[in-house]
Amino acid sequence: MAIGTLPKELKGEWIWLPEKSGRGARDVRVFARKEFVLESSVPFSELWISAIPSYHVYVNGEHVGYGPAAPTRTKCYGDFYDIAPYLEVGSNVISIITCDMAIPTYSRYPHPPKIWCQVNIGDRPVLWTDSTWRMIEPQCYSGGQPRCHAGLEYTESPYRK
């Protein structure tokens, strides 16, 4: 991960599941995925990414990084990675896992969860988040048992009155 200024040309949209706003739903996880084709090898490729509240990003199944720095009530942060070592000529996949714990705190960013990313080769954007990304709420995190967090009571519990 590196710190720098955003690319000159910004593309993409903040995306999330259309049926989920993230408000009031605790422990919502989202998998986002986009396939793309690379015609030739590249010496350097930037992946810019941000998410509220957090993300793990993978390229072709390899974990590239996680972040961003914790958002404040007025700002969220972005990161960039050189993903050229992870790219292959032909078919490639970028995958993002994010989770909205929806923990109510005084410092929590007051906006719904969302993801944004953009891939540049050279100075040219070649891939960005938009409505064509495949997004799902995975069932693999629904273990049928109560989950808890150090700062909260049980979030899903048969013991709740």
Task: Name each region found by the language model.
Residues 1-7, 21-22, 27, 32-161:
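Accessory beta-strand-rich segments of carbohydrate-active enzymes
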